[in-house]
Amino acid sequence: MNRIIAVNSNCYHGFSIEEAVAGIKAAGFRYIELTATKGWTEHVFPDQSFERLLEVKDKLDAAGLIPFAMSGHCNLMDIERIGDFIKNIRLAAFFGCEYIVSSIGEAHLKDNAVADNETVAGYIRALVPHLEKYNLKLVLETHGKEHGTGKVLAEIARLVGSERVKVNYDTANVIFYGRVDPCEDLMECIGDVAYVHLKDKAGADDVWDFPAVGKGCVDFPKFFGQLEAAGNNSPFSIEIEFTAAGPKDLAEVNQAVLDSAEYLIAQGYTL
């Protein structure tokens, strides 16, 4: 099956971008989602020096990894954070990305503002000229209690009314935050899904436990079949966030990335 399959550098939360690049390359991947999430994983970030950003770009080129997407999470309900997100859009363009990922609220910071769907759709609609200028697509991630299902995110994307704003379907977040079955929820929004965070879920629904893909309870064969049947060729970006304790060392992260690669190859995918 021909589909972009990447690894989110957030799998290497707590480790350097250099370590992430090395591990992702070693597992056989050709695509990477860079992480620029404030207060969490800042592998690349707008306040880094131009010299440092060029250094990262050169390392990606040397490794043969294509930075096709960037996680640039900001609270899109907070007008004070929109300027920060525009900087993230420009950073994504600098790296030549096609996609920028954001949750509606903050991913790992406290939300300083909330808004109803109509209001946040208006804020996002105002970003469309910036997305057009830099030829990017914004994919809204299923994340947080209020925005934890694809159904809700699809409603917001439709309110925005632009082909440049779609849904990033996180297969584990919809369980952890939304308390829904991903295969059931997907059918509520599949026409609006343009990107997938391929993340597995283990343990109880409300427990932070996101192992290597294929090691948890998500029914990926069914999920893949639904996408194929709908002709939805959205890119996959693997995200592994382990337990609340985190991975014990870099070797554990590298092994989880490799295990995920082997699982997808066994499912018929080409990296």
Predicted regions and their residues:
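A short beta-strand-loop structural module common to alpha/beta enzyme folds
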Residues: 30-41
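Active-site anion-binding loops
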Residues: 39-57, 61-67, 122
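N-terminal small/glycine-rich loop or linker at the start of catalytic domains
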Residues: 1-6, 66-73, 107
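Active-site-proximal loop/turn and secondary-structure-junction residues that shape catalytic pockets
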Residues: 11-13, 36-38, 73-76, 104-108, ...
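Active-site acidic/histidine proton-transfer and metal-coordination neighborhood
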Residues: 18-19, 31, 54, 59-62, ...
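Alpha-helix N-cap and loop-to-helix initiation/capping positions
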Residues: 44-52, 80-87, 112-122, 144, ...
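Histidine-acidic metal/acid-base catalytic patches
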Residues: 1-9, 13-31, 61-64, 96, ...
